[in-house]
């Protein structure tokens, strides 16, 4: 079992109990060094897991870095192209870790569970043969997570709430059409998603291991 999540530094004692009961064995953290230093990480001192830090971006986007976009779709396509360009090797490394993990369940996460995490999830699901419609629907569920994250910030962290309120609202959208466009673009430019991930360092052996491990056999 593989999960995607948002920032796990916010886990409560009850959350950790639930994760122990589910047998969580590994955490893959896709955030930057700065995010971890500022906000913390999964509390491995309280729940020992294999912890892998793979910073997909060197730093998070600042408002001055981001061009003006008229739609959520256009912003997110710009952002996801940037992530794949800058952090493709880290996404490939994450796929390799998932393929060879000693045990599951495991979880991979970033800050909001949407962009870096959403891209890794989309690539993983596509490798496993999941249809695009299901991948896009899974990504769109992040909207529900964003509502919960905003509510948490309002109650627990005025600083985080202010940061979210002052950031471009494109940051918090997850329209399913973005995943459809992205996967179609990868196929147009590289031939297939498999060819794309091969180009960023995912081996044929890793692809086979992921499928063997995570796809249930037909009865």
Where are these regions (language model features)?
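Cys-dependent protein tyrosine phosphatase-like superfamily
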Residues: 1-107, 119-219
């Amino acid at each position: 079992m593989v999960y995607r999540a948002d920032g796990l530094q916010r886990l409560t004692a009850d959350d950790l109990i639930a994760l122990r009961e589910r047998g969580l064995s590994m955490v893959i953290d896709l955030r930057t060094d700065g995010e971890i230093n500022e906000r913390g990480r999964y509390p491995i001192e309280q729940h020992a897991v294999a912890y892998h830090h793979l910073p997909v971006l060197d730093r998070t986007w600042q408002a001055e870095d981001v061009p003006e976009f008229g739609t959520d779709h256009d912003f997110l396509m710009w952002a996801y192209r940037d992530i794949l360009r800058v952090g493709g090797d880290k996404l490939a490394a994450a796929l390799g870790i998932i393929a060879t993990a000693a045990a599951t369940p495991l979880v991979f996460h970033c800050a909001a569970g949407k962009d870096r995490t959403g891209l890794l999830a989309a690539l993983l699901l596509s490798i496993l043969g999941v249809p695009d419609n299901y991948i896009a629907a899974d990504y769109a569920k992040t909207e529900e997570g964003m509502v919960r994250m905003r509510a948490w910030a309002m109650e627990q962290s005025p600083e985080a709430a202010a940061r979210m309120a002052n950031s471009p609202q494109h940051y918090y959208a997850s329209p399913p059409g973005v995943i459809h466009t992205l996967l179609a673009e990868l196929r147009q430019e590289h031939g297939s998603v498999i060819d794309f991930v091969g180009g960023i360092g995912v081996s044929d052996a890793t692809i086979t291991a992921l499928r063997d491990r995570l796809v249930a056999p037909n009865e």
